[in-house]
């Protein structure tokens, strides 16, 4: 069969499968591609192809992730599936594979298990906006009351971690039945129902171009007779010539006006998300701006020094620390384009953090950085990455 060409006209959404080991995340991923392949919305990808996921590097950390793509009536999806639990932790914290939503896979035969809990907590901490549940292996449970019990347990667990447990769609089925064509109701039909729920329940993410303008400062030049040019890659939004913008982070926030946008030495009337541009700033001196600050739409982002974070600390095999660290550890936190020193405060009852751990912690930076929830950072010691993290909540 000829490979169907993907039409890029549908809105795009990034999702992934999460849940406890052996509850059927990878089987479900394969089953989705199998069922959607019937309507030309996917190319069937077998279990073993997904399971031997290639290694990738994100922020200096090696992660194994499998990527498949498929489409439904409404959307085009990029779907990530990780072979091991550690890969999920790293993936979600580094944002290597950004998730606009996730399918939580729970085995009906086992109910929620330790990693079910941990993945829900991680999804909450790193800001995954919405979850849909697939209750897998329902063909192994004969008692409908038992299924209801597991469903109640899952809903309670979701509510405990501040997801709307009562409203989240839970689809009952069997990924294996779909792969083996054994039971149409629990297999094929359940997968289609799952995708209908994912389409309906996971909100369409706002495209970067529609969000308020932000550009991390990479370099600053002064051009005689023209003023100061700041270069960088536009992270989101649009910058038009004549726009008023703020310079945020490290020092007091300054206001300025963009009097020119250039790309590849040509003058443009605007730069947008994804563009590498130089922005000419009116009346701003070369020494007023530095790498590590951001240009942004006025009022859209504030500078902060204290925040709660979820972080993963590299093992020594991954090039990380060889020894644990304690409260008052002072590494550098690399945000966007620069390192800022910060002090780590561990939660009550956590004596120390070992290489390979993931941990919730509080950080106090010595200078403010433009930040918001979900912002990713690296933890470094003398330029060497020893961890990765994400801002879970801002304190001040």
UniProtKB/Swiss-Prot annotation:
The UniProt annotation puts the region (G2) at: 60-64
Identify the residues that bind GTP. Answer: 19-26, 81-85, 136-139
Where is it predominantly found?
cytoplasm
Asked if the record carries the keyword Cell membrane, the reply is: no
Any idea which positions bind Mg(2+)?
A: 26
* Stretches for region G1: 19-26
Family matches, as InterPro entries? EF-Tu_GTP-bd, EF-Tu_GTPase, EFTu-like_2, EFTU_2, G_TR_CS, P-loop_NTPase, Small_GTP-bd, T_Tr_GTP-bd_dom
Catalytic reactions on record: GTP + H2O = GDP + phosphate + H(+)
Residue intervals of the tr-type G domain: 10-206
The protein's job, in short, is:
GTP hydrolase that promotes the GTP-dependent binding of aminoacyl-tRNA to the A-site of ribosomes during protein biosynthesis.
Q: Which family does it belong to?
A: Belongs to the TRAFAC class translation factor GTPase superfamily. Classic translation factor GTPase family. EF-Tu/EF-1A subfamily.
Q: What is this protein called?
A: Elongation factor Tu
Lineage of source species? Bacteria, Pseudomonadati, Pseudomonadota, Alphaproteobacteria, Hyphomicrobiales
């Amino acid at each position: 069969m000829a490979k169907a060409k993907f039409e890029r006209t549908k809105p795009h959404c990034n999702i992934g499968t999460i849940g406890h080991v052996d509850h059927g995340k990878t089987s479900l991923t394969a089953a989705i591609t199998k069922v959607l392949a019937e309507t030309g919305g996917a190319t069937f990808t077998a279990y073993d192809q997904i399971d031997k996921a290639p290694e990738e590097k994100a922020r200096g950390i090696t992660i194994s992730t499998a990527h498949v793509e498929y489409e439904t009536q409404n959307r085009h999806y990029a779907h990530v599936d990780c072979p091991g639990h550690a890969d999920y932790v790293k993936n979600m914290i580094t944002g290597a594979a950004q998730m606009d939503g996730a399918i939580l896979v729970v085995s009906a035969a086992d109910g929620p298990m330790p990693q079910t809990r941990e993945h829900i907590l991680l999804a909450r901490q790193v800001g995954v906006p919405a979850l849909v549940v697939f209750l897998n292996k329902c063909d192994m449970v004969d008692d409908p009351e038992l299924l209801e019990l597991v469903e109640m347990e899952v809903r309670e667990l979701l509510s405990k971690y501040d997801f709307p447990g009562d409203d989240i769609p839970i689809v009952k089925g069997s990924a294996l039945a779909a792969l083996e064509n054994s039971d149409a109701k629990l297999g094929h039909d359940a997968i289609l129902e799952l995708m209908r729920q994912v389409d309906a329940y996971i909100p369409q993410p706002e495209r970067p171009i529609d969000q308020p303008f932000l550009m991390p400062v990479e370099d600053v030049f002064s051009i005689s007779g023209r003023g100061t040019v700041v270069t960088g890659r536009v992270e989101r939004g649009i910058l038009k010539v004549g726009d008023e913008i703020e310079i945020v982070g490290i020092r007091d926030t300054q206001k300025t006006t963009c009097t020119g946008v250039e790309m590849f030495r040509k003058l443009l009337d605007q730069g947008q998300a994804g563009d590498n541009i130089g922005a000419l700033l009116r009346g701003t001196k070369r020494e007023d701006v530095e790498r590590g600050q951001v240009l942004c739409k006025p009022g859209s982002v504030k500078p902060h020094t204290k925040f709660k974070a979820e972080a993963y600390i590299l093992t020594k095999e991954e090039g990380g620390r060889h020894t644990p660290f304690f409260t008052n550890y002072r590494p550098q936190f690399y945000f966007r384009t620069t390192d800022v020193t910060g002090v780590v405060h561990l939660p009550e009852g956590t004596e120390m953090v070992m290489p390979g751990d993931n941990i919730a912690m509080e950080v106090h930076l010595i200078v403010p950085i433009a930040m918001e929830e979900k912002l990713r950072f690296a933890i470094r010691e003398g330029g060497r990455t020893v961890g990765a993290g994400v801002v879970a909540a801002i304190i001040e």
